[in-house]
From Swiss-Prot:
Protein purpose: Transcription factor which function may be to trigger the increase of adhesion at stationary phase, possibly by counteracting or replacing cbf11 at the respective promoters. May also play a cbf11-antagonistic role in the regulation of a number of other important processes such as extracellular material production, colony morphogenesis, ploidy maintenance, or meiosis.
Sequence segments annotated as region (Disordered): 130-207, 248-289
GO molecular function: DNA-binding transcription activator activity, RNA polymerase II-specific; DNA-binding transcription factor activity, RNA polymerase II-specific; RNA polymerase II cis-regulatory region sequence-specific DNA binding
Origin organism lineage: Eukaryota, Fungi, Dikarya, Ascomycota, Taphrinomycotina
Induction: Expression increases as the cells enter the stationary phase, with a statistically significant peak at the late stationary phase. A similar increase in the mRNA levels is found in the sporulating cells.
Organism, scientific name: Schizosaccharomyces pombe (strain 972 / ATCC 24843)
Family statement drawn from the similarity comment of this UniProt entry: Belongs to the Su(H) family.
Encoding gene per record: cbf12
A Pfam family the protein falls into: BTD
Gene3D superfamilies named in the record: 2.80.10.50
Protein location: Nucleus
PANTHER family: RECOMBINING BINDING PROTEIN SUPPRESSOR OF HAIRLESS
Polar residues biased stretches: 143-207, 249-289
Keywords noted in UniProt: Cell adhesion, DNA-binding, Nucleus, Transcription, Transcription regulation
Protein name per Swiss-Prot or TrEMBL: Transcription factor cbf12
Length: 963
């Protein structure tokens, strides 16, 4: 059966002479290799291959094979990366001692002639794999057209289809036929066509089979139409690994654009850049793994490889590979620059690669990059040191040699004279190695050819060994709001605050990060955060954003004077303009609505849904709704305290702690550097909180746990369920503990605030405390009241106020205290949402979309060893992993909290608060844990979620630990 007949390129596309020269070289090489494969049984040839160990190129003369005599110039400009060992020799032999017709690996460096300067160069050996997993060592031809290669899985097993330059014959012509064809060409026949062969021809047959030439057919199976316009990058399948072959200027590590476009086809694909041929005494190893980003040469080579969008989609539909379940890294909605734009920005992109020189393993790989198949590369103090890392295939097949340069100098990341220079700036001597390895901009990373698809297990292995990939949202918001009428604007108070933790957020500081929120009834009117505040490692505020971009640029071009204290490590934003005008719906806890929050940039879009927000229409309804909603304040709740003065004008002052910025910086840095980081247990200790106290702020607030001292004194003798349902009342002694920093207040007495007066005579608990109540906090020891000292930069202090007496003649019997506005506080219950995801390399060069971010509120293990996960935002196909072990999800159900919930829940906070403080629309996942996870020797494993092609960290670990 003959291959697909296609029209051969015209003279307008390809110069005839170069086309014939390239075709002649292809067929000569294919014929020679076919002869070698067929005659491996020859003792003479076998001994020759064993003696040379394939360390020298092999020149073929007719039916004989001899080592090539390479000139010194050829040795200095090219190399061979052989793959041949005793193991492969034994694998290539049958049981009777004879050789296979097609061994797994045969790589030969073949001399080719340079058409411009007549110098002799060598092609780098490589292999290609067809759909039947047969290894073929013939090289592709390359022309000056901007086309790329795609295997045709729908044709014959040995047939390939190609979208342009990389064209391979479906069968190998004989040497005599090639000589006949050369004679025809030399005679000057204008009607000479490329000989093709309609019959199937196996390379293992070598010269023994002579198919009849068919001059009327074009011998290349090519189902897609050639198009020159560069639209989207080509996407080679994992079975083909093109070589790194560019003719480069020896005076520079970066090839010029002229050297790429003006080089002949043979030079373009046959010559390599600065590799050395190993000596015979050197122990042969599999080709070493280069940096995950590849070489600058590869970038220059493949930025010309483009195909049209229709052809790309059609080709992808014909490829049946394990990567089909992964989304393609390039979406039609993502704009791509033209070739001229990429050519123009190349010099800047290459300059921005310098920040990777400390650890090339930190360079972001892509969807099918082999970075997932190896352990993280260790840091090296020698710039030109090679990294001993070997790739493995997903399907358990043979290892394909990687022919990319393996040293930092060959990759163009170091200047040639940097061998004797100190590779670390003085300011980074005591810092973690990845401090200078964070990319400044995702769009500055050049595209590379993807090598292999990845599995979830390999992605988990990568993210758990590269903790810098972890990023997080931490959102704090009130549990209810007041309805606005007409033109009235009752803004949400306290406003929604969003913390951006993890340094990967800061790779796109200049990409105009947008944070917005809207209610479910008003989706078309989102409210945006006006400013995003950034903080450095010491918790100091960095502003404005132009300074952020400047410090990011300094990090990528660091020197002795670089100020790393100006580099941000986390950010936060306040959404102060959110108000609600609807009616809400009754969900059993009162009337409520739902919020949606989104975070988007040029490369990301994340969405948080179903954030419940209680609604009250009038303050007079607050007391009536106490028994049927979450209006009341209970023992263990998270609350926010703010001063009521000008609270409805977005100028409220919020109670916080003096070291909150420094504590959040520590958490964000731990997410980057500490692989054992678990936010449920990673809380500041007493030493870190030494000297910290309560403070006020208007651009940041933090939730506080509120505890009854009487309930805490009961200790283990009380029922935790009863304690969590304990409603707080006035005149009770409480303490406040910051949820973020752990700073604790002194014992305080709750006092109801009425008409600027506070009663001093009542001592017994009386009226229950509910949200938006007016309160005063009296120190239990000094009997003074908590207030804001405006003279001391809004610091927290204590005052006695003006005392009122029932008997003016007896000053010891004061009944009331008249307090200033700075001592009047409002309290409201709050809720927090934490979702952590891994910013993987697979998302670096694609538009990363997560329509629903999951977050886990609490978990528990029942008496039947079934694992329960409670939270929101779960997809129907969510997967639960305990490190590398997958748990089977038995059911996904809506959960309605009640008082019968067992007390053995593990909350996302250090204190197990009541269920009523959680969101009302919880989802319950019931999972079955594998038996192996109950063994006493099981290692500490993070509990991960996988949905929307994204890995999420739940914040919990297995085995479960109550805290």
């Amino acid at each position: 059966m003959s291959p697909n007949v296609q029209k051969r390129p015209s003279s307008e596309d390809i110069k005839t002479q170069e086309f014939y020269d390239s075709t002649r070289n292809i067929r000569r090489v294919a014929t020679a290799i076919g002869s070698i494969n067929a005659n491996l049984e020859s003792p003479q040839l076998y001994s020759l291959a064993k003696s040379t160990s394939l360390q020298e190129p092999v020149r073929i003369y007719g039916d004989s094979v001899s080592p090539a005599i390479s000139s010194s110039k050829a040795h200095s400009t090219s190399s061979v990366s052989p793959y041949y060992s005793e193991k492969n020799e034994s694998q290539a032999l049958n049981a009777d001692g004879t050789a296979f017709a097609n061994p797994s690996f045969h790589s030969f460096g073949l001399p080719q002639e340079d058409s411009q300067d007549n110098t002799q160069t060598y092609s780098t050996p490589y292999t290609t794999m067809n759909p039947s997993n047969e290894m073929h060592p013939y090289p592709p031809a390359t022309f000056e057209n901007n086309y790329s290669v795609l295997p045709d899985h729908s044709s014959q097993p040995n047939a390939y289809s190609f979208t342009g330059s990389n064209i391979l014959p479906t069968q190998s012509p004989s040497l005599n036929q090639m000589q006949d064809y050369q004679n025809l060409q030399q005679n000057g026949s204008s009607n000479t066509t490329i000989p093709s062969f309609s019959s199937q021809h196996d390379l293992s047959q070598g010269l023994t089979h002579q198919p009849v030439p068919n001059h009327d057919e074009y011998a290349f199976s090519y189902p897609y139409e050639l198009q020159r316009k560069p639209l989207i990058p080509a996407h080679p399948v994992p079975s083909f690994r093109p070589t790194s072959a560019l003719k480069v200027n020896m005076n520079s590590n970066v090839p010029s654009s002229d050297s790429v476009r003006n080089s002949s086809p043979n030079q373009y694909y046959a010559s390599t850049s600065k590799q050395s041929i190993p000596s015979q005494s050197q122990n042969l190893q599999p080709p070493q793994k280069a940096s995950v980003l590849g070489t600058v040469n590869n970038y220059r080579q493949y930025q010309n490889s483009f195909i049209s969008l229709n052809d790309y989609q059609a080709a992808q539909s014909n490829i049946s590979s394990p990567s089909s379940r992964f989304p393609t890294p390039y979406s039609p909605s993502v704009p791509f620059g033209t070739y001229q734009e990429k050519e123009k920005s190349y010099s800047q992109d290459h300059a921005e690669l310098s920040y990777y020189q400390q650890s090339p393993s930190m360079m972001p790989p892509y969807d099918r990059s082999s970075v997932y198949f190896q352990q993280p590369l260790s840091r090296t103090d020698v710039p030109n040191q090679s990294f001993q890392q070997y790739p493995t295939t997903v399907d358990g097949g043979s290892m394909i040699p990687n022919l990319y340069p393996t040293s930092a100098e060959q990759m163009g990341l170091y200047p040639q004279d940097s061998q004797n220079k100190d590779t670390y700036p003085k300011s980074l001597v005591n810092r973690p190695s990845s401090a200078v390895c964070e990319p400044a901009r995702n769009d500055s990373i050049p595209m590379m050819v993807y090598s292999q698809p990845v599995t979830i297990e390999q992605r988990i292995q990568y993210v758990l060994s590269n903790c810098h990939c972890l990023s997080a949202f931490y959102l704090c918001m009130p549990s209810l709001c007041q309805k606005s009428y007409g033109t009235e604007r009752r803004y949400l108070c306290p406003p929604i605050v969003l913390y951006l933790l993890g340094t990967t957020w800061l790779n796109n500081v200049t990409d105009n990060l947008k944070i917005s929120a809207q209610t479910l009834e008003d989706k078309d009117n989102p409210k945006f955060a006006k400013n995003i505040f950034y903080y450095n490692a010491d918790g100091a505020l960095i502003s404005p954003e132009t300074d952020i971009a400047k410090s990011t640029y300094q990090l990528t071009n660091y020197n002795e004077n670089t100020n790393f204290d100006s580099f941000p490590v986390w950010g936060n934003a306040l959404l102060k303009t959110i108000y609600y005008t609807g009616q809400g719906k009754n969900d059993g806890f009162g009337r409520s609505t739902f919020l949606q929050l989104s975070v988007q940039s040029k490369t990301k879009y994340f969405k948080l849904e179903n954030l419940r927000l209680g609604v009250i229409s009038k303050p007079s309804q607050k007391r009536a709704l106490m028994k049927v909603s979450d209006m009341s304040i209970r023992h263990g709740d998270c609350v926010c305290l703010f001063n009521r003065y000008r609270a409805q004008h977005n100028n409220a002052l919020f109670l916080g702690t003096s070291n909150v910025q420094r504590a959040i910086s520590k958490v964000s840095l731990n997410m980057k550097y500490n692989s054992n980081y678990f936010p449920t247990t990673d809380a500041p200790n007493d030493a870190e909180n030494e000297g910290a106290g309560l403070a006020m702020a208007n651009n940041l607030w933090e939730p506080f746990y509120i505890f009854s001292v009487d309930e805490l004194n009961k200790g283990n003798n009380s029922n935790p369920s009863d304690s969590r349902s304990k409603v707080l009342c006035s005149n009770m002694v409480i303490i406040l503990v910051s949820k973020i920093t752990g700073v604790q207040s002194p014992p305080l007495i709750l006092k109801k605030h009425d008409n600027w007066k506070v009663s001093l005579s009542s001592r017994a608990p009386s009226e229950a405390i509910n949200c938006l109540s007016k309160l005063a906090f009296q120190c239990h020891e000094t009997k003074r009241f908590l207030y804001i000292d405006e003279k001391q930069s809004s610091e927290i202090s204590f005052t006695s106020g003006e005392l009122e007496y029932s008997d003016p003649n007896d000053p010891t019997k004061a009944t009331h205290s008249v307090l200033p506005w700075s001592a009047m506080w409002s309290i409201i219950s709050t809720q927090s949402v934490r979702t952590m995801f891994y910013n993987e390399p697979i998302h670096q060069n694609a538009f990363h979309v997560v329509p629903s971010m999951p977050f886990v509120k609490f978990i528990r293990l029942d008496e039947n060893s079934m694992f329960h996960i409670y939270g929101t935002g779960f997809a129907n196909d969510v997967q639960i992993w305990m490190a590398y072990t997958r748990c089977e999800v038995k059911s996904i159900n809506a959960f309605k909290p009640d008082t019968t919930l067992p007390p053995d829940i593990i909350s996302d906070s250090r204190f197990s608060s009541r269920v009523y403080a959680c969101t009302a629309n919880l989802i319950e996942l019931i999972c079955e844990i594998p038996v192996c996870m109950f063994e006493p020797t099981v290692e500490l494993s993070p509990i991960l979620l996988f949905q929307y092609e994204t890995l999420f960290h739940s914040g919990y670990k297995w085995p479960l630990e109550s805290h």
